[in-house]
């Protein structure tokens, strides 16, 4: 979905409450995989380019797509988050600059166009291939695959005054690339390998505070005793790490893992999967959490949510001990 708009606007009402944003959420709730343009409103502003995600790209459930140049750098025009209700958008980034598109006004019927309206059809095409690989793919599975398997992109401040850091405390997703750069081949392979007889769940809550080297526990089902399968956990864009089987029968019904030390504090996402082989992988369990530098003692699960006061101010999130 794209409105074809390209102008600079600062938003205070891009909270997903507009009629068309709510309609896009309803489309996803009906089981239809949906991709939306982030918008082309970042412009060249030094600060105000943040919070320029346009409606309906601010809808919560669809995948909102940012645009990359041909060199895979983030396009200067591509709108950045946050939304005005402080959600992280976009969700993913793919190439949208200098794309050949139909144009009846030209001699050969084509012209070069740039915008998130060019990036979004590419992401929709990737989604179509994923559905071809797995006709039963759900919108939530689609989003979890993008979140877990996108190529990690580091935010880099360039000399260009229009490129600024809109993601003060975000690591994955961030408000410029989302979960990262689309990886079409991996997305399609993973979609085709989903085995719903395999399941995994982490014992953590959304936005739980997680200390350095915290222990994460969880449950899994679908593996027989002594099988070659395993539970794997990934923090942000790091590599998948194998958990420890804590079950009595060697079937991973109970598992744990002590997280590797993290370098970047702030909001990120922890992913878990039950892996049997390349053709049989469980749906992803994904949880947004808050990483802090304090080292966990006795491999505890992390601080209780009430031990920190989360203060929201504009696009900033401050963690204050209480």
Per-range role (PLM):
Residues 94-172:
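Hydrolase catalytic cores
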Residues 1-61, 84-87, 104-120:
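Substrate-binding/access-modulating region of protease and related hydrolase catalytic domains
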Residues 39, 173-175, 180-229:
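Secreted peptidase-domain scaffold signal
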Residues 25-32, 39, 67, 128-135, ...:
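Sec-exported extracytoplasmic/periplasmic mature domains
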Residues 202-302:
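Long, low-complexity serine/threonine/glycine- and acidic-rich segments characteristic of extracellular
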């Amino acid at each position: 979905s794209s409105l074809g708009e390209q102008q600079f606007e600062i938003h205070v009402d891009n909270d997903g409450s507009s009629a068309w944003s709510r309609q896009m959420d309803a489309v996803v709730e009906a089981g239809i995989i949906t991709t939306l343009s982030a918008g082309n409103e970042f412009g060249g502003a030094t600060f105000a380019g943040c919070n320029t995600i346009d409606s309906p790209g601010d809808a919560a459930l669809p995948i909102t797509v940012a645009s990359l140049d041909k060199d895979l750098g983030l396009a200067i025009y591509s709108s950045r988050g946050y939304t005005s209700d402080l959600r992280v958008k976009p969700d993913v980034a793919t190439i949208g600059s200098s794309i050949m598109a139909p144009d009846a006004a030209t001699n050969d019927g084509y012209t070069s166009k740039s915008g998130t309206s060019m990036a979004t059809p590419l992401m929709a095409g990737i989604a179509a291939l994923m559905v071809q690989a797995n006709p039963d793919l759900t919108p939530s599975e689609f989003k979890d695959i993008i979140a877990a398997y996108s190529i990690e992109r580091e935010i880099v401040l360039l000399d260009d005054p229009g490129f600024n850091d809109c993601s003060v405390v975000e690591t994955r997703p961030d408000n410029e690339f989302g979960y990262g750069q689309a990886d079409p081949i991996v997305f399609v392979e993973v979609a085709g390998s989903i085995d719903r007889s395999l399941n995994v769940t982490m014992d953590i809550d959304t936005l739980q505070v997680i200390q350095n080297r915290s222990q994460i526990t969880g449950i899994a089902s679908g593996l027989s005793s002594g099988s070659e399968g395993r539970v794997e956990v990934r923090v942000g864009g790091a590599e998948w790490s194998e958990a420890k089987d804590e079950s009595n029968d060697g079937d991973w019904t109970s598992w744990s893992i002590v997280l590797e030390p993290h370098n970047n504090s702030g909001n990120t996402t922890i992913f878990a999967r039950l892996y049997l082989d390349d053709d049989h992988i469980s749906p992803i369990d994904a949880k947004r959490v808050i990483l802090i530098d304090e080292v966990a003692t006795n491999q505890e699960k992390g601080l209780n949510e009430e031990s920190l006061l989360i203060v929201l101010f504009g696009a900033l999130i401050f963690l204050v001990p209480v």
